[in-house]
């Protein structure tokens, strides 16, 4: 393994503006992917990792939650430029060793950009910043666990600690984490989904009874119409472009709804096909609606109004499976079209064209992401998407349904495993039945509540399972001040980030294994699992030796913290969970 190389920091002065692109991917994406992979990993590690990325016997990509094709239908290179870069960042040969931390004070590190911090490589040892210290220094694993346990058990109330989860944590780690936190005695389990698809989860739960997608990848391929609102797959979910290409080849139409005309929704040059290398690729969007910011609610109601006017409805489905249709019908019939135009920035002709495409389709898939969720009325907007699907019976049948496209690779799985500050009573009852303790029943802190509680001195311990809390959360200045006011911060991480530097009076960095690495426990080789955007759960096994012999897996770290904190309380066998998961 190469020693850590000092890298130049990122400079915004080097940014340039180029003409807008008219396509995504192509040979350039391959060249950039390979360049980054070879620079960060070298030829041998590049070959070993990328050949296993998103393969049935390999490891799951950490860059997004787009689903994998069924085994037997996957390409040899089943990854995108983003995925190759994410793997290169984790499987880098650079290392952030104790010598690195001795050389750089926390203030020095904090003066660098987030990009530079990540370029310093994998953290090799557990590290601690003691009260009043200027540098991180190594700490023994057992000493770290004892310190955490002493701080947690010394709290006046269990609710004075909060336990954050990033969507890259595995199902196994997430389950152990929430079990420990609830056995400890709190539901303070904020996670990254609080800041992205929380409005989706609420809207879908309140309308169709489950806060997840209702489609599979095959449904996307079989759709006659795909509506993509507030989402840019070319940048955020590039492998989705392959699915859209298949749908187009099968005759699908695509409507894109976004203020910007994103290159990835104009044309896709698939680098694994000749026409994507030397040809023009595949045209994607048939209609682009350049909507005003947050005009989506008005647009979806206007589309519903036209479908009602034309009686382009599935009355049998409405009668058998829905409630509240008449109220919705009367509401959309009474829309003021001048207000619709002001809200959407679209002409009536543009909206009519989109509605005619909906009218002509009996198999429609609706996709969306942050462009819909990140508004005060996000829940209401997403419910209008659901209303369109229900009005035409486009749910619960092949080639049709709802597809909230998730970002973090296991953000959906973490919620399934119980990472939620507002758990259902049925879930808590199941925990009680299985493990013999009565979990706390009061709702805990979400992300914003956690920030406020730290700011106000009501939370003094922060534990982060992955992620970069400081950079991911709203109101950065307030978040920084809140974290710096805590007594202890604990970060379970693979690489250096800002949240290690904006920390509590005492701070711990607990380095963990990544997706690309082998995981050997007492019972032998382990694998983890993740859940993608279409609710498919699959295994992940890394091919590489760990970046350092001092690393521990997420599950190992969490069960060790639980053992040190709870001992034999509740009779939960943490060791058995650690030895074989």
Identify the meaning behind each predicted range.
Residues 61-64, 80, 196:
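Disulfide-bonded cysteines in secreted/extracellular proteins and peptides
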Residues 67-87:
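Iron-sulfur (Fe-S) cluster-binding segments and ferredoxin-like electron-carrier domains
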Residues 428:
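Acidic, glycine-rich segments within the central catalytic cores of soluble metabolic enzymes
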Residues 2-30, 121-409, 417, 431-581:
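Cofactor-pocket helix-loop regions in the catalytic cores of large enzyme subunits
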Residues 86-135, 145:
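Low-complexity, highly charged intrinsically disordered N-terminal segments
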Residues 418-422:
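Surface-exposed loop and adjacent secondary-structure segments within mature catalytic domains
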Residues 63-66, 467:
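Short Cys/His-rich local motifs and their 1-3 flanking residues in nucleic-acid-associated proteins
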Residues 1-59, 64:
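Intrinsically disordered, low-structural-confidence terminal and linker regions
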């Amino acid at each position: 393994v190469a020693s850590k190389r000092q890298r130049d920091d990122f400079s915004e002065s080097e940014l340039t503006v180029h003409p807008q692109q008219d396509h995504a991917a192509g040979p350039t994406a391959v060249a950039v992917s390979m360049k980054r992979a070879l620079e960060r990993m070298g030829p041998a590690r590049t070959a070993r990792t990328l050949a296993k990325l998103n393969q049935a016997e390999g490891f799951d990509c950490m860059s997004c939650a787009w689903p994998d094709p069924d085994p037997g239908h996957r390409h040899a290179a089943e990854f995108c430029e983003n995925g190759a870069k994410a793997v290169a960042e984790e499987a880098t040969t650079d290392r952030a060793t104790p010598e690195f931390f001795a050389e750089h004070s926390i203030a020095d590190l904090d003066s660098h950009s987030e990009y530079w911090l990540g370029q310093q490589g994998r953290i090799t040892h557990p590290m601690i910043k003691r009260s009043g210290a200027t540098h991180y220094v190594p700490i023994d694993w057992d000493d770290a666990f004892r310190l955490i346990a002493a701080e947690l058990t010394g709290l006046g109330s269990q609710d004075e600690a909060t336990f954050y989860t990033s969507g890259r944590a595995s199902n196994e780690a997430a389950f152990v984490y929430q079990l420990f936190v609830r056995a400890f005695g709190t539901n303070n389990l904020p996670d990254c989904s609080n800041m992205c698809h929380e409005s989706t989860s609420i809207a879908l739960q309140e309308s169709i009874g489950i806060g997840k997608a209702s489609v599979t990848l095959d449904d996307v391929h079989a759709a006659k119409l795909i509506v993509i609102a507030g989402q840019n797959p070319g940048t955020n979910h590039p492998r989705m472009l392959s699915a859209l290409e298949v749908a187009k080849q099968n005759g699908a139409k695509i409507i894109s709804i976004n203020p910007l005309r994103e290159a990835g929704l104009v044309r896709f040059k698939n680098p694994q096909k000749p026409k994507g290398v030397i040809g023009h690729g595949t045209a994607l969007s048939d209609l682009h609606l350049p909507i005003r910011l947050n005009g989506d609610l008005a647009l979806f109601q206007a589309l519903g109004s036209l479908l009602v006017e034309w009686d382009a409805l599935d009355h049998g489905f409405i009668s058998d499976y829905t409630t509240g249709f008449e109220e919705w019908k009367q509401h959309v019939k009474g829309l003021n079209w001048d207000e619709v135009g002001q809200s959407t920035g679209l002409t009536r002709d543009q909206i009519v064209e989109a509605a005619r495409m909906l009218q002509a389709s009996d198999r429609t898939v609706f996709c969306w992401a942050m462009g819909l969720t990140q508004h005060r009325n996000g829940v209401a907007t997403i419910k209008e998407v659901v209303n369109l699907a229900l009005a035409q019976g486009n749910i619960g049948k092949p080639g049709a349904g709802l597809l909230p496209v998730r970002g973090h690779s296991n953000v959906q799985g973490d919620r399934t495993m119980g990472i939620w500050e507002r758990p259902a009573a049925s879930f808590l009852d199941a925990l009680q039945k299985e493990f013999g303790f009565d979990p706390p029943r009061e709702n805990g802190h979400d992300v914003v509540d956690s920030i406020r509680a730290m700011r106000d001195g009501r939370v003094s311990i922060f534990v982060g399972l992955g992620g970069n809390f400081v950079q991911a959360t709203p109101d950065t200045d307030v978040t920084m001040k809140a974290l710096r006011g805590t007594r202890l911060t604990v970060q379970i991480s693979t690489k250096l980030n800002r949240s290690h530097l904006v920390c509590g009076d005492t701070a711990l960095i607990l380095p963990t294994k990544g997706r690309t690495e082998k995981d050997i426990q007492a019972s032998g080789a382990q694998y983890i699992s993740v859940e993608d955007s279409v609710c498919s759960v699959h295994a992940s096994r890394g091919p590489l030796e760990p970046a350092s012999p001092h690393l521990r897996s997420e599950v190992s770290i969490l069960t060790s913290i639980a053992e040190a904190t709870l001992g034999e309380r509740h009779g939960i066998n943490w060791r058995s969970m650690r030895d074989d998961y």
